[in-house]
């Protein structure tokens, strides 16, 4: 094998690695969601705010939910499906009251959140999030109806290393396209 053909082979290998890395970057990025896209977690003016909001997002492992609220006025708890349905705030899975609650999504499943403050849940300050795939159970447990389902406890943690945005997705997509085009051009020149 001559030096020239070895160089061409190396270029093709490097380009293939770049394409694979570009595709993997998109898979490992995560998104930080501000719950409800609102300024604060609280009793909603529209009763369907927290039931509509998760339907417009695809949550995956590695994403995070950020609940913002005045700590002297509100709180956040994770509850079981039956407690979500009945607005029972006793014996929560997890309780936070720091006003800047970050919840990392660490496994697939359905999660149930509400305020620990009396009466807030019955005023629709509650959120059901399906991680991994859309769930018919999420639809069934919207404020108008409910059914029991398994609950998954997740741990809180630090802010994710990267926050996926439409700009980063576009950049990754553009990088992959350019790398693929270059690889095709090099392979075509070799042939």
From Swiss-Prot:
Record flagged with keyword Lipoprotein: yes
Entry GO terms, CC: plasma membrane; side of membrane
Cell location: Cell membrane
Cystine residue pairs: 87-121
Tissues expressing the protein: Mostly expressed in seedlings and roots, and, to a lower extent, in leaves, flowers, stems and seeds.
Signal sequence coordinates: 1-22
Keywords: Cell membrane, Disulfide bond, Glycoprotein, GPI-anchor, Lipoprotein, Membrane, Signal
Propeptide regions on this chain: 166-191
Residue positions with a glycan: 104, 108
Topology with respect to the bilayer: Lipid-anchor; GPI-anchor
Role summary: May act as a carbohydrate transporter.
Name assigned to this protein: Early nodulin-like protein 8
């Amino acid at each position: 094998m001559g030096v020239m053909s070895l160089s061409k082979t190396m270029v093709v290998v490097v380009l293939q690695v770049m394409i694979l890395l570009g595709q993997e970057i998109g898979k490992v990025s995560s998104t930080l969601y501000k719950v409800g896209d609102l300024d604060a977690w609280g009793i909603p003016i529209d009763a369907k705010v927290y039931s509509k909001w998760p339907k417009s997002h695809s949550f995956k492992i590695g994403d995070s939910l950020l609940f913002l609220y005045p700590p002297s006025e509100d709180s956040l708890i994770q509850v079981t499906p039956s407690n979500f349905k009945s607005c029972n705030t006793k014996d929560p899975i997890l309780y936070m009251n720091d006003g800047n609650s970050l919840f990392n999504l660490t496994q697939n499943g359905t999660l149930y959140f509400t305020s620990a403050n009396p009466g807030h849940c019955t005023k629709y300050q509650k959120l059901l999030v399906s991680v991994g795939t859309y769930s018919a159970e999420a639809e069934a447990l919207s404020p108008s109806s409910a059914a029991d389902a398994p609950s998954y406890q997740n741990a809180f943690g630090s802010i994710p290393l990267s926050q996926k945005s439409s700009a980063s997705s576009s950049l990754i997509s553009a990088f992959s396209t350019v790398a693929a085009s270059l690889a095709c051009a090099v392979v075509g020149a070799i042939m």
